[in-house]
Structure formats: structure tokens, C-alpha cells
Amino acid sequence: MGISRDSIHKRRATGGKQKMWRKKRKYELGRQPANTKLSSNKTVRRIRVRGGNVKWRALRLDTGNFSWGSEAVTRKTRILDVAYNASNNELVRTQTLVKSAIVQVDAAPFKQGYLQHYGVDIGRKKKGEAVTTEEVKKSNHVQRKLEMRQEGRALDSHLEEQFSSGRLLACIASRPGQCGRADGYILEGKELEFYMKKLQKKKGKNAGAA
């Protein structure tokens, strides 16, 4: 028996059973879920779908393109861990990558980009003490440019804490089982606070259970 998306097997509105009055149709088929796992052994399958179109079914992934909205920067980075999923805790336990899953990504590419753009190495010292690196001698023109950029520079304190730990919380915005990629965005502001509270609550519950 294949997976079918028809309504013939459902009961009537009155609650009575309905007889199968025709066979299954190709256009009503369903496929097994991808359940994309977090793994370094990247596996993506090509699937021919209706109309001769193509879907890319990611079975194992560990990298993705993540954008940092407030800085208008996108970097390819490693996904390190699945931290939270609003729909199902089982998906966190099994490290499954789905749309809207909250994951921890490697902060290094963003750190590097920030250093290049502002000349500031974030996440080095304690909160609020960003260090300006003086290792490479810069020309006056470059120094003036960096100073101009620093005037409008603002960094969320929560984000700075995460940069010190080397892991950033991010949300997956693509559908790995449909397009074969796990792309998303770095959490900031109110959204970041919301998910940090959720994770803290979860940690507290686990500690209580233990």
C-alpha cells in the first residue's frame, strides 16, 4: 500500500463509512518524509515529480547559508546542533533539520566578516569590551573608512555573548526535504529573546527531571 492523499478512505460528514468506489490515482500519491539529519556525510537525492519537475530531497546536511539581517551579511557556515523545535521535541532528540527549527551555527565566518568590515574582533573579551586589532598595519584611507563605519555600529548584547561562545542561534527558513538546502537567518532582537527564554525553560525542566 502506497501513501495516498485522497479522501475516499475518510468517513462521511454524517460519520458513516464510505465504500472505495475507485482505485488510487497517481496524482494523489504521497512520499515518505525526508527527516533530514544533521551529518557531515552530505546526501541529497534528485526526485522527479509531477509535470516533469524536480525536487531535491536532502537526507543528510551539515552546512547552510545563513543571513545576518541587521548587518546585511550572508555567510556559508556549519550547523553544529539542533537546539529547539516548536512542533516536536522528538525532532530535537533525533537532530532533524526542518523548516523553522532553531539551530546553533558556527560563528567564525560572521566574526571574520565583522572584523573585516569594522576592524573589531567581537566575542574576545568580557561583554562590552570589543578589541580593535592592530596586527596588520592599515593605510590612512582604510583607517578613516573603518572609523566612519564604527560611528553607526551597534551590536546586541545577547549576540555578543553568543559570539564569545562561538555559536549563534539561527532559524532554518528553507525546506531541506523540498529544495535540498538548509538556509536560514541569525536570530536577533525580540525573536532571539523569545527563543532564549524557551531554551532556558527547557533546560530548567530537564534539570528538575534529573
UniProtKB/Swiss-Prot annotation:
Gene that encodes it: RPS8B
One cellular component (GO) term of this entry: cytosolic small ribosomal subunit
Family label: Belongs to the eukaryotic ribosomal protein eS8 family.
Superkingdom classification of source: Eukaryota
CDD domains: Ribosomal_S8e_like (cd11380)
Name of the protein in its database record: Small ribosomal subunit protein eS8y
Biased composition (Basic residues): 8-22
A GO molecular-function descriptor: structural constituent of ribosome
Keyword entries, A-Z: Ribonucleoprotein, Ribosomal protein
Species whose genome carries this gene: Arabidopsis thaliana
